[in-house]
UniProtKB/Swiss-Prot annotation:
PROSITE patterns: CARRIER, PHOSPHOPANTETHEINE
UniProt modification remark: 4'-phosphopantetheine is transferred from CoA to a specific serine of apo-ACP by AcpS. This modification is essential for activity because fatty acids are bound in thioester linkage to the sulfhydryl of the prosthetic group.
Protein name: Acyl carrier protein
Main subcellular location: cytoplasm
Transmembrane regions: none
Organism for this UniProt entry: Geobacter sulfurreducens (strain ATCC 51573 / DSM 12127 / PCA)
Gene name in the database record: acpP
Length: 77
């Protein structure tokens, strides 16, 4: 597991209040991890802060699961 993948999973678990074991690469933030739209906004903000990147609203809408977040951050850091 890459350091980006590990950190993304830690942030997702922390932001959504779920156990890290539930945070699999294909876990959907809303469907599998119980996030609502506010949770996803806060999650994107936490990822931006952690990785010092800016995620546009358009791109944020495309980040639906853990792997999407990992891929986006890997491409933009």
């Amino acid at each position: 597991m890459s350091s980006i993948e590990k950190r993304v999973k830690e942030i997702v678990a922390e932001q959504l209040g779920v156990d890290e074991a539930q945070v699999t690469n294909d876990a959907s933030f809303m469907d599998d991890l119980g996030a609502d739209s506010l949770d996803t906004v806060e999650l994107v903000m936490a990822l931006e802060e952690e990785f010092d990147i800016e995620i546009s609203d358009e791109d944020a809408e495309k980040i639906q699961n853990v792997q999407d977040a990992i891929d986006y951050i890997t491409e933009h850091t």
